[in-house]
Design a protein with these regions (language model features):
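Basic/Trp-rich segment in TM-proximal cytosolic loops or flexible interdomain/linker regions
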Residues: 179-183, 187-315, 334-342
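Acidic donor-binding segment of Leloir-type glycosyltransferases
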Residues: 1-33
Length: 342
């Protein structure tokens, strides 16, 4: 009797409304119908038709563990200044390689988001089941379209007004995750584009001490990574083509043979007189740090330490595909090309 479920039909063209009507007899379930306007309008419509002290939204492709709600609510009970709590998102029963890679990535995210929660640096409250005090919406307003990343914009807005956001690492919400690389690319393109544009929208609060870790480290680190990824990708491609040209030059000089020896050092720019060893060493350290945080994240979820070879698959494959959506998102941002939801 303490929970009210509001289901919104956002202008569907199938039999969604007929299915929802089967639940209207339940006293704690309210069904609403509106013209299609996008997720943020549907969530706002539900908020406007509710009167509860706490508000949460659950995506259609997600579900929660039985104890998740109770675990998240303890954060509000312990600290009345906590205005939102984010859960840990996990991939349910991955069936494709793409979903398996996301499962490993989300293990890493469990650890990183907990750290951000402790330091006050959370910049996104995930759509699936983040819980807010109603005060957030009465004081700051409802969700905005925000470049199709309303869950990120509301977190930026809350940080701007010094509203505390925490993260409950043992509150698990499961999602299916994109099944194909193409679907994953579209999802991440939207996420990265949203980050770039929301950062630009809230640029006036960046690098200011009064906004704490969020302003000084969390978002700037994301911006640096946006710049570093295409830069590193460029260096890598330069070295690859440089190696190919050296092979061609060698074959032209000594004739064709089957000796494919290639001394690959990444990256090696003689023009800058930079030691290749320093780049290689830094790269190794970064990979080891990511690997360690993935293992720690998995430990937080399962209670057990252990190395999983899927970590290697994730790090190798994502190293090649992640720059694609990062570069495209930055291109879209620079040339004002909006991204679609799907």
């Amino acid at each position: 009797d303490k929970i009210t479920i509001i289901a919104v039909d956002d202008g569907s063209t199938d039999n969604t409304w007929e299915v929802l009507k089967k639940f209207e007899k339940h006293s704690n379930i309210k069904i609403l119908k509106k013209e299609n306007g996008g997720k943020h309008t549907a969530v706002n419509y539900a908020i406007q038709n509710s009167d509860s002290e706490f508000v949460s939204c659950l995506d259609a492709d997600s579900f929660v563990e039985p104890e998740t709600l109770k675990r998240m609510m303890t954060y509000f009970l312990k600290d009345e200044n906590t205005m939102a709590v984010a859960p840990s998102i996990l991939v349910h029963n991955p069936k494709t390689l793409t979903q398996t890679l996301q499962q490993v990535e989300y293990n890493w995210a469990v650890f990183m988001k907990k750290v951000l929660g402790i330091l006050g640096g959370i910049y996104v409250t995930p759509g699936p089941f983040s819980i807010f005090r109603r005060k957030v919406f009465t004081d700051l307003g409802l969700f905005k379209k925000a470049h199709n990343t309303e869950d990120m914009e509301i977190a930026f807005r809350m940080q701007k007004h010094h509203y505390k956001i925490d993260q409950c690492n043992d509150a698990y919400v499961y999602t299916t995750g994109p099944k194909t690389i193409v679907a994953l690319y579209k999802q991440r393109l939207r996420w990265i584009y949203g980050f770039v544009m929301n950062t630009y929208d809230y640029r006036k609060i960046l690098l200011k001490k009064e906004y704490g870790f969020f302003s000084l480290i969390s978002v700037p680190a994301g911006v640096v990574s946006m710049i570093a990824v295409p830069y590193i990708l460029g260096l890598l491609m330069f070295q690859i083509f440089k190696g190919i040209f050296k092979l061609i030059e060698k074959y032209q000089t000594v004739g064709f043979d089957f000796n494919f020896g290639w001394n690959f050092a990444w990256p090696n720019f003689d023009m800058f007189f930079v030691s290749t060893n320093a780049y290689v060493f830094t790269g190794i350290i970064l990979y080891l740090l990511v690997m360690s945080t993935i293992i720690i994240g998995k430990r937080m979820i399962t209670g057990k330490y252990g190395f999983d070879f899927r970590i290697i698959y994730f790090m190798v494959i994502f190293s090649f595909i992640a720059p694609l959506w990062v570069v495209r998102a930055m291109y879209n941002a620079v040339f004002a090309k909006k991204t679609a939801w799907r």
